[in-house]
Design a protein with these regions (language model features):
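N-terminal hydrophobic or amphipathic segments with adjacent small-residue motifs
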Residues: 37, 45, 50-53, 80, ...
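Hydrophobic residues in beta-strands and at strand termini
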Residues: 14, 79, 128-130
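Residues that form or immediately flank small-molecule/cofactor binding pockets and catalytic motifs
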Residues: 12, 82, 100
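Mid-chain, well-packed structural core segment of small domains
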Residues: 62-91
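HotDog/MaoC-like acyl-thioester-processing domains
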Residues: 1-7, 85-132
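Hydrophobic residues on conserved beta-strands that form the core of alpha/beta folds
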Residues: 9, 72-74, 123
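Hot-dog-fold acyl-thioester-processing enzymes
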Residues: 1-70
Length: 132
C-alpha cells in the first residue's frame, strides 16, 4: 500500500429499506428517516439516510478493501447532498498517507467521497490499521 493508491469504487443502491433499517438499527427515530410524508412536510422530497448509516457504509467500504483484520482507528465524515430512495451512492477512496503502526502494522489515512445523483453525499477521512 502506498500514498496515492486508489480503492476500487463501490456502488451502493440507496433503497427505502436501507434508509429505514439503518435508522432503526442506530436508534435514530427521527421521522424524516422513516416517514415520507413527514419528510415532505419538512421540505425533503422523501426520507433520507442518517449519518450513522453513512458512517457504517464508509467503514464497510474501507474494511472490505483492506480485509477482515483491518481496524478502523478514526472515521471523520461530513454529509452533503442527501441520499434518497432510488439513487445510487458511489464510494471512492484514495490512500493519502501511510505510516508504520504499532506492532508491525501499517496505518493509512484514506480520503473518502460518496457521490449520488445530487452531488457529494459524504466526504471525509478514515484512519485504518492493517497488520502486515
Amino acid at each position: 500500500m502506498r500514498a496515492g493508491d486508489a480503492l476500487p469504487p463501490l456502488e451502493v443502491p440507496v433503497t427505502r429499506t436501507l434508509i429505514v433499517a439503518g435508522a432503526v438499527a442506530s436508534r435514530d427515530y427521527q421521522d424524516v428517516h422513516h416517514d415520507a410524508e413527514a419528510a415532505r412536510e419538512k421540505g425533503s422530497p422523501d426520507v433520507f439516510m442518517n449519518i450513522l448509516t453513512t458512517n457504517g457504509l464508509v467503514g464497510r467500504y474501507v474494511t472490505d478493501h483492506f480485509g477482515p483484520r483491518a481496524v478502523l482507528r478514526k472515521v471523520a465524515i461530513r454529509l452533503g447532498a442527501p441520499n434518497h430512495p432510488g439513487d445510487t451512492m458511489t464510494l471512492t477512496g484514495t490512500v493519502a498517507e501511510v505510516a508504520d503502526g504499532p506492532e508491525g502494522a501499517v496505518t493509512a489515512l484514506v480520503r473518502i467521497t460518496g457521490a449520488n445523483g445530487l452531488g457529494r453525499h459524504v466526504t471525509g477521512t478514515v484512519t485504518v490499521e492493517v497488520p502486515r
